[in-house]
Amino acid sequence: MSAPTLPQETETAPAVASAVPGGSSAKTWSVGTLTYTTGGLILLVVLLLAGDFAWSMRERSVFPLFQVLLRKYEASDLLSSLLLGSIPACLTVLIWPVVSVWSDRTRSRWGRRIPFLFLPTPLVAGAMVGLAYSPQIGVWLQQLLGGTGNPKLYILSVFGLFWILFEVFAMVTNSVFYGLVNDTVPRVLIGRFYALFRMASLGAGVYFNYSLIGYAESHAKEVFLVIAAFYLVGFSLMCRFVKEGTYPPPPPVVQNDTFFAKIGRYFRECGHHRFYRLTFVTLSLASLAPVAVNLFSLYAAKSYGIETDKYGKYLALSYICSFVISFPLGWLADRYHPMRVASTCMAIYALTMVAGFFWVHDASTFAVFFIAHTVLSGCYGTASMGLYPMVFPQAQFGQFFSAYSLLFNFLVFGASPVLGYVLDLSGNWYLLVFAISGGVGVATVVLWVFWYRQFQAGGGVKGFVPPAPLEARE
């Protein structure tokens, strides 16, 4: 058998199997123009998981660090919801569709995804360095402008600036990362691969919340700097060594097309079929369900007397539970289809959150339902990861995935400040977040029934084929 190699492109390396003793052929896996031996597949998985671990350390750490610092400098719930929810959602609406379609159409020597992952990476790390030094910059800015008194307004302003820069650059990588997986991982392994992805992400979450979050208030600068360096090195190495295949030419560009004509065509292509419209709404509601608890769980914990370090331990415990069940969930998704497994997980999550609204009354019961929230929403996330490549057309995966993300973030953009305002009016009655997440989950399950009927009409779990893109139908 040949030595472990990265995938070979079938146009330049026609052989798809390596000889093994006894005259048989080694098993291979293919996706697009890429063909993997066992060794090549293992190497791909290791590289992608290493990149995902670095990416997850960024995703799992920066958000809670920023939450802690916003509370430390006395940001209101409304301001927190704007910075943590609405502004990132607005940026997603503006950036994600443009970058994803641009990536779908890109043809370069490095592929169509890697350039959009590698180039923003140092900028993301730089924004994290800016967040690390925001308190010092805020104090310096106050002195420069001749301000007096508490510098928290200046510090929060600098935090907001670097947070927005961080979100802009991170959004570019987020918009195409799953596209890289879609283009390089064989379909027959997608459920188990995403389970491994989930395990890497959870491992990053366990490490951060068990070991580092307790230092968020006292050593935030050092934590930011370490994570920035780790992300810069780890994600860059993945971009350097993962190889994409070759792609067919993109559809021709319409000459003299105006900006608004391009927007109109984007929405026509994504929404031309009822199945896709139901897909976008159902998946967006499913992703929206945990948002209320996610945004305010740390503040809710503090309202029950739970300190940041203990909150981190609860979060780490929930990630350990999720880690243990991730691969079995991936196997179940491959065996019974992500459509079935993900909907079951969402139904259980919705009922549990509704129960939490009625039963949480002290620190212990909050801990139980908070851990349940994290584990069950994670179960849905793990089970649904393999669903996206199955319900969106592969050639335009980035575009269709961005349409789902656009709708989801539009909902977050509108809902986050309303939620923050309601919590401010209620006197910070954080128990409401369980009712809201549970209610959105119930609505998702109801809508999923209609979506599943459309899915069955298109071939179901045995032979579903995504409806043809509009250009193919025309």
Which residues are covered by each model-predicted region?
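Helix-to-loop junctions at the C-terminal end of transmembrane segments
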Residues: 94-110, 216, 325-338, 423-424
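Multi-pass alpha-helical transporter architecture, strongest
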Residues: 131-138, 233-242, 437-469
